[in-house]
């Protein structure tokens, strides 16, 4: 990481994420409200009601709390981010990786938008999930789906 701008106290987090993902050139660490709320609760995000979420993410794992500004903020990041473009950081926020910084930020924005809609939906009534068989068909018919990108 080069340049004259002062490095973030969480530079170790960015370095660990990029080390694990040589296909990516940028990492974005943001405290987006909905994603951070899940991080505060220590909850993975698994939604079956949104085709967008299912195709792009399928799930967003949440790592345990790691002390910011120390190496512990990056505990578990290398394993988790190998198979995910977006990870929640327990009691903290989130980090996404992408080929460019714009790509990494767009990943966070997409997840945040889906979560806004999901929580509005819960206010209106029960959320109706997409069946597992329909989700399998969705994954199989979209070569760009997360499952097809990572082979899982």
Which sequence ranges carry the predicted segments?
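Glycine-rich flexible loops
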Residues: 1-152
């Amino acid at each position: 990481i080069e340049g004259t701008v002062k490095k973030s106290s969480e530079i170790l987090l960015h370095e660990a994420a990029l080390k694990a993902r040589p296909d990516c050139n940028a990492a974005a660490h943001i405290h987006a409200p909905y994603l951070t709320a899940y991080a505060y609760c220590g909850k993975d995000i698994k939604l079956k009601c949104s085709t967008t979420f299912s195709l792009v993410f399928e799930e967003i794992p949440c790592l345990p709390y790691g002390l910011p500004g120390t190496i512990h903020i990056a505990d578990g990041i290398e394993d988790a981010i190998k198979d995910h473009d977006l990870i929640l950081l327990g009691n903290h926020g989130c980090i996404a990786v992408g080929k460019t910084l714009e790509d990494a930020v767009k990943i966070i924005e997409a997840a945040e938008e889906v979560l806004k809609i999901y929580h509005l939906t819960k206010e209106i009534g029960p959320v109706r999930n997409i069946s597992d068989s329909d989700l399998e068909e969705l994954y199989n018919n979209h070569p760009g789906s997360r499952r097809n990108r990572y082979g899982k």
